[in-house]
Amino acid sequence: MATKITGVFILILTITFSSSSAVTATQQAPSSSPPVLTCTEELVMFSPCLPYVSSPPNNMSETPDPICCSVFTSSVHSSTGNCLCYLLRQPMILGFPLDRSRLISLSQICTDQNSEESFESLCSVSESPELPPLQSIQFTNPFVSGNNVSASPQSVDLAPEVSPSSDLFSPETATLAPPPPPPPLPVLQYFSSDSLKIRNFWFPSTIIMTFATSILARI
């Protein structure tokens, strides 16, 4: 009797454990699926295609890289495939210009479709009237052509603060300098009344003597 009870108990534990394992496996299955990329992440993942789709002087490649084709194909066929339409509608979204014709050609080069307008038709207003929301991104252009660095989001340099120069007036540091001396007064010649009388006397006397001398000289 005890043996039968033990066997039934073991059977119940086995069934319970099997049911718990099945429920746990069912609950863990959805978590193994890869997360869906956001629109911003789709554009960042598109970076291997930039050497091909960038406008001069950033067009460093004449053919797209195999990684570019893989990223483009997976992005176009994903649920957020129209995120790449930002590249066609806003060519300067990454901070530097993109070649529209090369963007459209990726449909023919990287996919099995023969239609060159497949990517363009996907991004048309009729197919994608509204694009998914896009978070703000700052995409740095990694390409350099010759000695010129390609256009990239610029950092704003703030002008340095101007320190007060030594010749500016400062109430705290200014010292009062003595005023300049007044200009010298003009020198005036003063004469006493006696000397003025003598000068007035000699002046007509001289004229008379000169006039008398000239008369005597004529006689």
UniProtKB/Swiss-Prot annotation:
Mode of membrane association: Lipid-anchor; GPI-anchor
Keyword annotations of the record: Cell membrane, Disulfide bond, Glycoprotein, GPI-anchor, Lipoprotein, Membrane, Signal
Glycan-carrying positions: N59, N148
Disulfide bond entries: C39-C85, C49-C68, C69-C110, C83-C123
An example Gene Ontology CC term for this record: plasma membrane
Annotated SUPFAM superfamilies: Bifunctional inhibitor/lipid-transfer protein/seed storage 2S albumin
Location within or outside the cell: Cell membrane
Record's function text: Probable lipid transfer protein.
Family: Belongs to the plant LTP family.
Protein name: Non-specific lipid transfer protein GPI-anchored 25
